[in-house]
């Protein structure tokens, strides 16, 4: 028997974490789509019905696809933190600040007047949140959407590459 390469171990762990995240994203988007369909049948106010009916199925699909590289970013970061941590409790301690680092860029996307222009198009997580907002409003520039998807995927790939590099370091594994 030959030992398994460390890269394969990291990728196996990464895809396990990412699968859970993608499944969660899919359930969330499907739930939103289902409730949109229910509310657009006339159960809500007329303004809400008009708004909900204007969201196409392709928009929901694009929202889901925009979440995939975000899931990959978090899977890589969480895996990196879990490799570094000596125990579950220590890993939880490292992951708590990650929640705040995550929430802040998304909150900026919800502020009035913040649009998917200029610097905001390049701020990770904020750009995805703004793109999702633009998709729902029906005002998304699809060329910009692909640029945001690509830049987010590039960040996710960089984090995964760092995770693989770090997992190969003896000093991290046996500290």
Where are these regions (language model features)?
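Membrane-interfacial helix-loop-helix junctions in multi-pass membrane proteins
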Residues: 53, 107-122, 126-154
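Transmembrane helix segments
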Residues: 57-58, 85-122
